[in-house]
Amino acid sequence: MFYCLLVLIALTALILGPPLWAKRKDIATEQRLLVSMLYFGAIGAGFMGVELAVVQIMTLLLGHPTYALSVVIMGLLAFAGLGSVVMQSLPLQRVDMVLLAGVLLIAGLAFTLLPFVHTVLDTGFVTRIAITLSVLLVVGLVLGMPFVGGIRTLGEDREHAVAWAWACNGAASVIGSNIFMIVMVFSGSRVALLGASSAYIIAFLTRRRLAGRALS
């Protein structure tokens, strides 16, 4: 896993390094561009941390990794997409509230999800799937909003900034997924969820600076 992480970091540097070098003057002088990269990287890594930890926990509930992967990935992405749609009609001022809710929700899951799963292990399979989807509905709605909120904060007409947002989010998702897998192997899903919550704290803090500066 560590070897895979090093390879992913090297590939990311190879892909993003040249354009970053070409934009080094803009990045050095335009703080908002750097802040936006940190914001979208944080929510990308944090989302993957939640996804992987929930897959691990729901494997216990659903009885097989294949079921957990299918239900969690499908459910989380679908509900996150729904959250993105909802965010398009909400005031931008709500983004901070959503991020704070995400921090608290993920931290709460770290301490309550596994004990809750143990209490419903004796229910029927269909019921367990319904329980899983209910959890994912709440998580997906909340975690699906910050990306769209960030894009709206940047301004969709700022094409270069939006492109960097997608790039940093994708790169952080790939590298973050590997990091959180390592964390779960050595420390378990609770620590992984707390790490994901910390990533959303970073997003919460950077979002204020992102909204407070004009991008040239």
Describe each PLM feature range:
Residues 1-216:
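Alpha-helical transmembrane segments of multi-pass membrane proteins
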